[in-house]
Amino acid sequence: MIDTRYLLIVISALILAGCSTGSRGPALPEDFPETYVAGQTAVPIIVDGKLDDPAWSAAPWTAAFGDIEGDAKPEPRFLTRAKMLWDDEYFYVAADMLEPHVWGTLTKRDSIIYNDNDFEVFIDPDGDNHDYYELEVNALNTQFDLMLTRPYRCGGTYDIGWDIDGLKTAVDIQGSLNDSS
């Protein structure tokens, strides 16, 4: 098996902005998603898809990612984890994803990216499960960003025309792309 690492770094000034609807979040502690405390960096990160900036070495990895459906699905076969940092201007996310066959076909912004290998970030500034942002980036560095009023399962509406102001992304693939040989 080829050990292909797919890495992306996402930056957005807008993600630090908050919004409030007064809605309640999950009612029970077991309903809460995993959390991660992003550290502050004094020096801006270079957005190149690599984790060789000194600030990244001090940031801890998240726990290994699981399926969005939780225990109803088997453990993922390949490791995915992330790191997050912020400074006075940006919020940074880096992902390390092991995948033997990285594929990317979509090149148009706001395409339905999850049809390719992708990494998705959901940002809910006030933690109420409403008025949140979604960003997806595929192996070709194609971006899909939108704002949702609430989750789809709750009748939420979305705005695909909305773009993350100041967004910068980069992807570094250590291995092959679109080659299963």
Language model segments and positions:
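Bacterial N-terminal signal peptides that target proteins for export
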Residues: 1-8
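Bacterial N-terminal signal peptides
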Residues: 8-17
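Structural preference for beta-rich elements and adjacent junctions enriched in aromatics
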Residues: 19-181
